[in-house]
Design a protein with these regions (language model features):
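Short, flexible, solvent-exposed loop/turn segments with mixed acidic/basic and small polar residues
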Residues: 21-22, 46, 70
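Short glycine-rich anion-binding loops that position phosphate/pyrophosphate groups of nucleotides
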Residues: 37-38, 84
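C-terminal structural segments of small proteins and small subunits
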Residues: 55-84
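Glycine- and other small-residue-rich loops at beta-strand/loop junctions that grip anionic moieties
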Residues: 9, 35, 55
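Ribosome large-subunit tunnel/peptidyl-transferase-proximal elements
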Residues: 1-30, 39
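Short, surface-exposed beta-edge/turn micro-motifs
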Residues: 28-31, 76-78
Length: 84
């Protein structure tokens, strides 16, 4: 459960693949989280981009748990902690 703790406590974060991809492109994402049960065509381009930019990717078990860790009631395929 440790990976969620950092995300929960993060002051700034992105929720969802569109916002998270933008943060990676702008070099503001510190750590990216992707859900194992998300559609591969949704998260694979994001994971590839993170590798290119040298950003750590943490894979978590479920979209629902990732969403909850972000404080939303629905699932999220990805999220990121944004550097201050």
């Amino acid at each position: 459960m440790m990976p969620y703790e950092r995300l929960r406590n993060a002051v700034k974060k992105t929720i969802g693949t569109k916002q998270t991809t933008k943060a990676v492109q702008k070099h503001t994402a510190a750590i990216v989280y992707v859900a194992k049960d998300a559609e591969p065509h949704v998260i694979n381009p994001l994971v590839k981009l993170c590798k290119e930019k040298g950003i750590e990717v943490i894979t978590v078990d479920s979209m629902l748990e990732l969403g909850k860790a972000c404080g939303i009631e629905v699932g999220s395929a990805s999220a990121a902690i944004v550097a201050e």
